[in-house]
Each structure stands twice: as C-alpha cells, then as structure tokens.
Swiss-Prot record:
The chain crosses the membrane at residues 3-23. The gene is petN. It is a single-pass membrane protein. Keywords: Electron transport, Membrane, Photosynthesis, Thylakoid, Transmembrane, Transmembrane helix, Transport. The keyword Transmembrane applies. GO terms for cellular component: cytochrome b6f complex; plasma membrane-derived thylakoid membrane. Component of the cytochrome b6-f complex, which mediates electron transfer between photosystem II (PSII) and photosystem I (PSI), cyclic electron flow around PSI, and state transitions. The 4 large subunits of the cytochrome b6-f complex are cytochrome b6, subunit IV (17 kDa polypeptide, PetD), cytochrome f and the Rieske protein, while the 4 small subunits are PetG, PetL, PetM and PetN. The complex functions as a dimer. This is Cytochrome b6-f complex subunit 8. One of its GO terms (molecular function) is electron transporter, transferring electrons within cytochrome b6/f complex of photosystem II activity. SUPFAM superfamilies: PetN subunit of the cytochrome b6f complex (SSF103451). The keyword Transport applies. Its main location: membrane. It comes from Crocosphaera subtropica (strain ATCC 51142 / BH68) (Cyanothece sp. (strain ATCC 51142)). Belongs to the PetN family.
Length: 29
C-alpha cells in the first residue's frame, strides 16, 4: 500500500513537472 501510494505520487509529480516545463518553455521562461 505504501509503495503503491509512493509510486503514484512520484508519477503524478513527474507528470505535473513536465507540464510546467512545457508551459514555461512556451512562455519564453
């Protein structure tokens, strides 16, 4: 349960971070 939760949180964080990088890149950073 803990490992599954940790894995889900890490995947969600990586997904949101990648989106933020794309948005900032389009805005010219």
């Amino acid at each position: 349960m803990d490992i599954l939760a940790l894995g889900w949180v890490s995947v969600l964080a990586l997904f949101t971070w990648s989106i933020a990088m794309v948005v900032w890149g389009r805005n010219g950073f």
